[in-house]
């Protein structure tokens, strides 16, 4: 038990370092992209290039892990992130920035897919929601401190500095990964080696894919609103500097970190569906409220509300893990990562195109409306979703 917890903590902390690095650049990435004299519509690609690479690599990352082992997969991924962060920080044009972001996304896919699968493997059972929300909570803790660090670094050392900070954090994560030992029972826990037949089998599993639409919608809103529209709105509409934008994003991330673990505990008691539906509806409401805020205090209050609401999906990875077809956990977690990353790709691109189409020099209400409508619609779809954790809890209650 202690060894299991130590592995989960290690994977969670290193994942937190990786996400800390991602969030360090979040307050400055839209403005950094604009510094290359591009239209607002192309800003979304600078944010989404990272996730687009992850979409392409999430499932192949599972094949690579089967061939070389999860630990080697994770370490190589961290090396790629370090190198790509340095490349982004030294970019001389927009194309080079996009290239660096793509390489970083490949590295992230190699690391995060293996880490999520490893944790899902060793946390099977009635406590899965709590263990996976511990992982999510530490990951979100990384997002809590990153924006403030990034905003401060950019304000004092320039827009390029956060990318070098990103490299340092991932280098620390690489060092922390060295003591981990590859699990000896991975093939038994995950089933046979991943194959395209397995991938197609998982993709054709209707109940599993329905649950993953909630994953896609949640990440669509998170990257479209928090990572893209909020920095642009704060900068273009309210004229806030990078430091204050970083604080706004930190407030949201702290709220998420606070509510994530209680949400995981709750999901083990009442099932995954109720917390996830609450997350979708409440974050949609928050998205609609953001563009009505004309003061820093008001926007900060809405971001705190948004963060607490987003944390309700603390067991977001546990639900797909519960629904994974027998013997296909590794493949299922790869598909789960793909669905989340598709949301991460589409969110920024969609909202910035909508914002650019409006033709204003500021961010209007319409770009915030689009992700809100999507999460509301998907939230209603979840009424039909299966929830094994809720069924298990009901059976245990009846047995008592």
Identify the residue ranges that each predicted region occupies.
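Juxtamembrane intracellular "pre-TM" segments in multi-pass secondary transporters
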Residues: 1-4, 182-212, 398-400
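C-terminal membrane-cytosol helix-exit motif in multi-pass small-molecule transporters
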Residues: 168-186, 378-386
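Structural signature of the two symmetry-related core transmembrane helices
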Residues: 72-86, 167, 274-289
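Paired small-residue
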Residues: 84, 95-103, 286, 297-305
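Helix-breaking motifs and short loop linkers at transmembrane-helix boundaries and internal kinks
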Residues: 69, 90-96, 239, 271, ...
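A membrane-interface helix-boundary motif in multi-pass transporters
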Residues: 155-167, 355-373
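Cytoplasmic helix-loop-helix junction between adjacent transmembrane helices
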Residues: 100-141, 318-319
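Short amphipathic helix-loop junctions that connect adjacent transmembrane helices
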Residues: 28-40, 228-243
């Amino acid at each position: 038990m202690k060894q299991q917890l130590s592995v989960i903590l290690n994977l969670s902390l290193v994942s937190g370092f990786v996400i800390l690095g991602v969030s360090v650049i979040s307050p400055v990435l839209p403005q950094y992209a604009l510094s290359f004299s591009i239209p607002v519509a192309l800003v979304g690609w600078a944010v989404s290039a990272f996730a687009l690479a992850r979409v392409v690599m999430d499932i192949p990352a599972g094949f690579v892990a089967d061939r070389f082992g999860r630990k080697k997969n994770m370490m190589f991924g961290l090396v790629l992130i370090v190198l790509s962060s340095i490349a982004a920080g030294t970019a001389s044009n927009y194309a080079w920035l996009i290239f660096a972001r793509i390489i970083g996304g490949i590295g992230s896919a190699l690391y995060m897919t293996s880490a999520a699968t490893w944790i899902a493997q060793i946390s099977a059972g009635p406590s899965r929601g709590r263990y996976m929300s511990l992982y999510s909570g530490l990951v979100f803790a990384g997002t809590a401190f990153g924006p403030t660090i990034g905003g401060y670094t950019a304000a004092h050392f320039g827009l390029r500095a956060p990318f070098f900070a990103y490299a340092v954090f991932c280098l620390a994560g690489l060092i922390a990964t060295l003591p981990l030992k590859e699990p000896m029972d991975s093939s038994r826990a995950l089933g046979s080696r991943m194959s395209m037949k397995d991938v197609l089998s998982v993709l054709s599993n209707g109940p599993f894919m329905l649950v993953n639409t909630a994953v896609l919608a949640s990440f669509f809103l998170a990257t479209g609103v928090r990572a893209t529209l909020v920095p642009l709105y704060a900068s273009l509409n309210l004229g806030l500097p990078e430091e204050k934008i970083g604080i706004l994003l930190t407030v949201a991330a702290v709220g998420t970190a606070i509510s994530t673990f209680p949400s995981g505990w709750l999901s083990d008691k009442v099932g995954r569906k109720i917390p996830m539906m609450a997350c979708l509806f409440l974050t949609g409401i928050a998205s609609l409220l953001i563009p009505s805020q004309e003061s820093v205090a008001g926007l900060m209050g809405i971001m705190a509300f948004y963060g607490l609401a987003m944390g309700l999906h603390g067991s977001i990875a546990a639900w797909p893990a519960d629904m994974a077809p027998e013997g296909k956990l590794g493949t299922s977690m790869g598909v789960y990562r793909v669905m989340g990353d598709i949301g991460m790709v589409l969110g920024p691109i969609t909202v910035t195109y909508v914002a650019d189409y409006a033709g204003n020099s500021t961010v209007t209400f319409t770009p915030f409306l689009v992700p809100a409508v999507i999460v509301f619609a998907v939230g209603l779809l979840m009424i039909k979703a299966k929830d094994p954790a809720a069924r298990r809890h009901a059976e245990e209650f009846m047995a008592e």
